[in-house]
């Protein structure tokens, strides 16, 4: 329920209650550092029973920890508003979603496990065809070198108009243009160890750009009455399809099921879900204000790749709490918390896209450099709850396994606001 220049994003209707007419602008830079890790454990084939003509399975599962790192040192955003009497026009440009960029220097378990199963099955076929002359290839006989980089950004440009209907009520209507830009770039090379000949067993290579765009209608209201302020905003669902521009896609026939979504020209739904935001703030003392806020993202009604939104138990709930203290005339400090609760399920989670319930804590300060200029700084960190996904058919290998998904997130922000 903030009434400030950053309300162009969070509470645009509230900008009608800015204290003075004129033009305002805010420039913000955030730095985000994340980890996205997968602790994988899955069964592998270790031989072939020639009597019963069935593969044998290792007693000890294959275990590997896949580390994903993401760093975005500069995430810019610009907010602007012009107020004249009861009318206010506002807008912003920012990166509003997409998840950023992540690098897995040891690849992903979905590709490595499928490669291991494919190598084994191919060797069994040769073993049978040659009457046992060609050896069965098991994981101890080869090495796999793999890596995967993935990035997703949604660039947004919003413009809208607020109107102060009465002394205590205002409304907003606007639209946001969203441009999606993503890329997957990775490889997998499997080779026999030198003492087994050093021959190539399997090679995968992928370089796929993804783009798309969509429009989001936005409505908002704000009620300001004495020490109390209430703001609400509704963002309609954005229909967004992303199209592949695949520059490279090399794979064996056994990997057809894995690479299908990355083929050139494939269109995939990637809707931005509708979102309802309601917030209230109250100034208990001249120098002390507290606020509460709630967000609901209707993920189950947003189209996703393979229709996986149907696997969600429900949409996402977010609960936010904050407090501000004006220490002196030119200094305000603040603190806040956020709880994010997804409606996750095993069939929704995947190695290339997984979420974890979380809570975040943040602290900030605002310094008035002059009557017209303010400097804001803030720091936030997020603690995630690990998510364990158990599978009877691990990544299509026909064997059991599990992944434990975990994340960390730290964000530093700096912004400068100016009122002309």
Where are these regions (language model features)?
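N-terminal, post-signal peptide beta-strand-biased segments of exported outer-membrane/organellar beta-barrel
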Residues: 1-98, 354, 380
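Outer-membrane beta-barrel porins/channels
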Residues: 3, 20, 75-76, 81-420
């Amino acid at each position: 329920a903030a009434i400030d220049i950053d309300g162009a994003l969070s509470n645009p209707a509230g900008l009608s209650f800015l204290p003075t007419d004129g033009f305002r602008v805010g420039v913000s830079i955030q730095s985000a550092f994340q980890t996205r890790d997968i602790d994988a454990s899955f069964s592998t084939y270790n031989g072939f029973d020639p009597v019963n003509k069935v593969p044998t399975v290792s007693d000890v599962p294959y275990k590997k920890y896949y580390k994903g790192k993401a760093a975005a040192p500069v995430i810019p955003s610009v907010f602007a508003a012009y107020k004249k009497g009861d009318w206010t026009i506002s807008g912003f440009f920012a990166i509003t979603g997409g998840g950023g960029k992540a690098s897995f220097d040891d690849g992903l378990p979905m590709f490595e496990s499928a490669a291991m199963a494919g190598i084994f099955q191919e060797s069994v076929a040769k073993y049978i065809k040659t009457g046992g002359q060609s050896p069965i290839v098991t994981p101890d006989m080869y090495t796999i070198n793999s890596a995967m980089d993935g990035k997703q950004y949604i660039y947004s440009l919003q413009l809208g108009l607020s109107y102060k209907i009465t002394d205590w009520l205002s409304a907003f209507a606007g639209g946001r243009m969203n441009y999606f830009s993503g890329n997957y770039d990775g490889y997998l090379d499997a080779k026999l160890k030198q003492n087994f000949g050093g021959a190539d067993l399997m090679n995968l290579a992928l370089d796929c750009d993804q783009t798309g765009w969509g429009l989001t209608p936005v409505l908002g209201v704000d009620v300001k009455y004495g020490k109390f302020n209430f703001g609400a905003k509704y963002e309609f669902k954005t229909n967004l399809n992303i199209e592949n521009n695949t520059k490279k896609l090399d794979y064996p026939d056994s990997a057809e099921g894995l690479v299908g979504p990355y083929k050139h020209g494939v269109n995939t739904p990637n809707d931005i879900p509708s979102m309802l935001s309601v917030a209230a703030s109250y100034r208990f003392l001249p120098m002390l204000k507290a606020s509460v806020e709630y967000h609901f993202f209707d993920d189950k009604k947003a189209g996703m790749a393979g229709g996986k939104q149907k696997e969600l138990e429900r949409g996402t709930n977010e609960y936010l709490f904050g407090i501000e203290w004006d220490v002196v005339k030119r200094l305000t400090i603040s603190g806040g918390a956020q709880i994010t609760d997804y409606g996750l399920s095993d069939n929704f989670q995947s190695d290339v896209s997984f979420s974890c319930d979380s809570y975040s804590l943040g602290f900030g300060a605002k310094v008035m450099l002059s009557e017209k200029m303010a400097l804001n700084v803030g720091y936030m960190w997020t603690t995630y709850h690990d998510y364990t996904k158990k599978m009877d058919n691990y990544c299509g290998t026909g064997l059991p396994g599990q992944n434990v998904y975990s994340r960390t997130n730290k964000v530093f922000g700096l912004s400068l606001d100016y009122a002309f």
